[in-house]
Amino acid sequence: MTRDAVICEPVRTPIGRYGGMFASLTAVELGVAALKGLLERTGVAPEQVQDVILGHCYPNSEAPAIGRVVALDAGLPVTVPGMQVDRRCGSGLQAVIQACLQVRSGDNDLVVAGGAESMSNVAFYSTDMRWGGARGGVQIHDGLARGRTTAGGQFYPVPGGMLETAENLRREYCITRAEQDELAVRSHQSAVAAQRSGVLAEEIIPVTVTSRKGETVIDTDEHPRADTTVEALAKLKPVLLKQDPDATVTAGNSSGQNDAASMCIVTTAEKAAELGLRPLVRMVSWGSAGVAPDVMGIGPVPATEAALAKAGLQLGDIDLIELNEAFAAQALAVMKEWKFGEADFERTNVRGSGISLGHPVGATGGRMLATLARELDHRQARYGLETMCIGGGQGLAAVFERVAA
């Protein structure tokens, strides 16, 4: 018998810029801060957690199966298992989906799910050294950059990385530079307004950073820019301009490389009532889809179609949409496929997204859920959609329904 899986207290750390305020912290340390904060907020005893599932896109052997390592370092009993999920940019959402499946099936009653990423600390590596590669020289790869060009495997190479995929969509959907910059400014304005109103503070677990100067408690996102303007963004040079004179994708209309962690409790309504937890949403359905790797940014379209079909809903039934902004060109391409008009911006990324808040890839899905669930609650709306594109040519989507208090 299938049970409903509900989401309680989705939270996240502040989001740090690349090489910014969290550069000294590992993904594990960010995850530990988020998990401890979640348990403190909810009063859930560590031994009541039956699994810890974390999305993580840039792992190394310092923290294998990061869900388990974070659980142990956060002080959970050794009897609490944990694992790592990697569906690239969709990893955090996939972790939540996996937790919902475990709860729905009856295998677990309470699971912690989310993600953690420190893009500032992604490792450099070599595949040449173990068997005497030094004889002919050793090649060192930047793990952060390498994964973006190899995600299509042997037969679908994308030498220009994710930037190339955004330019491909820009070209296919006739998206102008001005449209991209306008979306980027709108994103920053939404995020800054949410910061100033205190809305984002509800989902944030403060993090303490220790340095030679002492301890600093950080409770605010670092990436949003209050001074961003279309005029300022127009001055930025497209990253692939040398390869493509028509290129339009810049650092200003792309998502950031960021550091953060996100967590939530996935359980049943009955267990939530027993523990005094308040469910915000339940997962209605989810869907994943594959697309050509060189246009990976269009992935949310078929993934959303699959999720909506399972839910018996249309896009018009959705009150709030979290569509991750990997690139402005990519987000606009999806919106064009959805035939969005100006009014649809009033329900899409209403508190900012990847361009403004940042995109700490493994943690992004949990960040989006924290915003979506709370915004549904604030507005007393019914349905929310969370969806993102995925490097390598995928899309992931999930439909959530607000749980009445």
Residue ranges and their predicted role:
Residues 23-111, 116-135, 204-220, 315-334, ...:
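Conserved beta-ketoacyl condensing-enzyme motif
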Residues 110-172:
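Flexible glycine-/small-residue-enriched beta->alpha junction loops
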Residues 56-111, 156-162, 227-256, 337-367, ...:
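Conserved catalytic cysteine-centered active-site region
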Residues 12-13, 24-28, 32, 41, ...:
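N-terminal extracellular/periplasmic Venus flytrap/periplasmic-binding protein-like
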Residues 1-25, 171, 229-298, 302, ...:
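Condensing-enzyme catalytic core mediating Claisen C-C bond formation in acyl metabolism
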Residues 164-167, 203, 211, 284-356:
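Active-site pocket-lining segment
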Residues 27-42, 66-70, 95-98, 162-169, ...:
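Short, well-ordered amphipathic alpha-helical segments that serve as non-catalytic structural scaffolds
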Residues 87-117, 170-199, 263-270, 335-336, ...:
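Active-site-proximal alpha-helical scaffold in enzymes
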